[in-house]
């Protein structure tokens, strides 16, 4: 989904994920209407600015949320998939760069393994090598999960897309 700044792209993924409400309509998954709680279980959301949503814990604790039996090896595997090799698990996420924080947020969602992965500007502000790594990772995930990306740079994801939309005046318009 692409659209100009202020068009509601972030609001769209927040509504789909169940963290924001909506005025009318319904959200369905395989013909079943879902409430906000059901959508929160179904979806994983990676924000454009994930630093706002970390809980002040260590990297390891953020990864382990909801996964009490998660091993260090599983944490390292998820971090490696997003290009965060040799990251100190004891560090707070707030000490990481913006790009590292975004990749950590993606790693958290990889461990959750939601059926729907929602990404708000997943490559914004990342250097090219990291961008390419994230795009390659998403290409591997697209066969296992539904992925919805909102972006100002749809051309970066052209090889992943099966459906493209523009958000214009609150309407999703197929391209």
Per-range role (PLM):
Residues 72-88:
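Conserved ABC ATPase "signature" region
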Residues 92-96, 100:
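Conserved ABC ATPase signature
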Residues 109-110:
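ABC ATPase C-loop
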Residues 17:
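Helix-to-loop junction immediately C-terminal to a conserved catalytic motif
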Residues 117-120:
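Catalytic Walker B motif of ABC-type/P-loop ATPase nucleotide-binding domains
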Residues 145-151:
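Conserved H-loop
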Residues 21-39:
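Conserved ABC transporter NBD signature motif
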Residues 127:
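ABC-family nucleotide-binding domains
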């Amino acid at each position: 989904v692409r659209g100009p700044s202020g068009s509601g792209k972030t609001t769209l993924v927040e509504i789909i994920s169940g963290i924001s409400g909506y005025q009318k309509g319904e959200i369905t998954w395989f013909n079943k209407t879902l409430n906000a709680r059901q959508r929160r279980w179904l979806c994983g959301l990676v924000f454009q600015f994930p630093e706002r949503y970390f809980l002040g814990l260590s990297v390891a604790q953020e990864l382990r949320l909801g996964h009490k039996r998660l091993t260090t090896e599983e944490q390292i595997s998820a971090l490696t998939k997003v290009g965060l090799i040799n990251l100190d698990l004891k560090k707070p996420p707030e000490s990481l760069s913006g790009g590292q924080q975004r990749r950590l947020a993606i790693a958290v969602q990889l461990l959750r393994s939601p059926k729907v992965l929602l990404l708000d500007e997943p490559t914004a502000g990342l250097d090219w090598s990291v961008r390419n790594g994230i795009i390659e990772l998403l290409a591997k995930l697209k066969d296992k999960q539904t992925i919805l990306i909102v972006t100002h740079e749809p051309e970066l994801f052209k090889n992943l897309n099966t459906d493209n939309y523009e958000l214009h005046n609150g309407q999703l318009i197929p391209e």
